[in-house]
């Protein structure tokens, strides 16, 4: 693969370690990612056809959050060498020398094992098994293998980030139904255009670290075409909950308008290929994609959790 990545030695690239404070250990958990995981898991629980005891639900969400944090921590432990090279990550606790790698490894493993065991005891072992699979997939399959080996890294690795709704549904029902699967697919297809939009702007940073992101391997033009292709899949897929009966009028409007906006922004990325306008188009898509996913899942949460569900008469005949 990349000689640069393989030649990086954490002992050589990381600053001398000192004692980290609580904020540094919390930063290892990637709190923004953790919040998104909890949110999508909550939606997975909410759209399930049955209900769960509120205490069990709250404990389960906490354990899902801890498991997600463990994944982030183990990812930062493994990626400390390349984090030290990339501009946007060099201030993270390990490359900045505030936390030693072995401290992060121990912290991550304890959280991973503890979260899985507690989720199994609080809810059920299917949910715990899915959480364990998510942690292993993100840490071993994505972080340790795919991220440095293939331009399809975030496509395949995106499965880890798409699993929380299925875990949430498993907490409630002890199984995984069509609702959890559809939400998984929405996040899975959303992931490539979201990350590749950022990669178009940060391609030099990724190249410096030796990470084979799509723009660096297939080129920016191919990446732009693939962004449009995935968005063409995402827009109609976002309407699937309406067709399957667990998304109503509010959700349908959000999915329709949001999907159209995603298409418009992806086409702008495809057209604007040089200079500042190209970067602006890519960052606009990147930023809106976050809002799109948030609004999509918020609409489901509002309809199912707050009783705002209004079926679309046309689809009901």
Curated annotation (Swiss-Prot):
Membrane topology: Multi-pass membrane protein
Record's catalysed reaction(s): heme b + (2E,6E)-farnesyl diphosphate + H2O = Fe(II)-heme o + diphosphate
Residue stretches in coiled coil: none
HAMAP family: CyoE_CtaB
Further details from the record: Carbon 2 of the heme B porphyrin ring is defined according to the Fischer nomenclature.
Similarity comment: Belongs to the UbiA prenyltransferase family. Protoheme IX farnesyltransferase subfamily.
NCBIfam families documented for this protein: cyoE_ctaB (TIGR01473), PRK04375.1-2 (NF003349)
Protein's recorded name: Protoheme IX farnesyltransferase
Organism this protein belongs to: Methylobacterium nodulans (strain LMG 21967 / CNCM I-2342 / ORS 2060)
